[in-house]
């Protein structure tokens, strides 16, 4: 009888340990899923930023016969295009975002100064394409920040914070933009 009782207690303890292990594995898997989702979304943002830079480059080509652009601007666009696909952190993405917005802002000023550019079909098409890319970037940024919020909340809450510490998960950075560039560039004709 005592042996049967020990076997039952042993089975109960084994089931409890198995339940805890399964729970830890499920929390770990959720962290991995969120981390991979954030990385994939950053990849989509990188692709969208590269598309934006390609469009900006085409816009510069369309506008430069009217307005003079410094060689530095063209060089900067090329540098940003090559660095965007290498960017691995939210901070690097934010820096590229900020610099490309500054360049786009300068181009928009040039377009405003030359009324004949506003009526150019090529310029209109490029501006429409840039607007679509801006919307795409905004959607990806929203998705990324939602994933990061869930990831960071899990790190802050019990019992998932124990699993996070056990496996070395650290909080992720949100994609945040400076106040003066937070608004999408206004593209209108």
UniProtKB/Swiss-Prot annotation:
Keyword terms, alphabetized: Cell membrane, Coiled coil, Membrane, Transmembrane, Transmembrane helix
Predominant cellular place of this UniProt entry's protein: membrane
Membrane association type: Single-pass membrane protein
One GO term describing the cellular component: plasma membrane
Subcellular location: Cell membrane
InterPro entries tied to this protein: LemA-like_dom_sf (IPR023353), MamQ_LemA (IPR007156)
Parts forming coiled coils: 87-150
Ranges that cross the membrane: 2-22
Similarity comment: Belongs to the LemA family.
Protein name (database record): Protein LemA
Encoding gene, per UniProt annotation: lemA
């Amino acid at each position: 009888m005592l042996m049967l009782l020990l076997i039952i207690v042993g089975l109960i303890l084994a089931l409890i340990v198995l339940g805890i292990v399964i729970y830890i594995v499920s929390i770990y898997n959720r962290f991995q899923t969120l981390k991979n989702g954030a990385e994939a979304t950053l990849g989509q943002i990188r692709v969208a930023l590269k598309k934006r830079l390609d469009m900006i480059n085409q816009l510069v080509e369309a506008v430069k016969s009217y307005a003079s652009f410094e060689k530095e601007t063209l060089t900067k666009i090329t540098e940003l295009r090559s660095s965007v696909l290498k960017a691995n952190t939210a901070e690097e993405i934010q820096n590229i975002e900020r610099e490309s917005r500054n360049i786009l802002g300068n181009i928009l000023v040039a377009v405003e100064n030359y009324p004949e550019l506003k009526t150019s079909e090529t310029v209109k098409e490029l501006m429409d394409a840039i607007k679509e890319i801006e919307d795409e970037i905004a959607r990806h940024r929203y998705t990324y920040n939602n994933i990061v919020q869930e990831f960071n909340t899990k790190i802050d809450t019990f019992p998932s914070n124990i699993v996070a510490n056990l496996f070395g998960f650290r909080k992720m950075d949100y994609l945040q933009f400076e106040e003066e560039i937070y608004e999408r560039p206004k593209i209108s004709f």
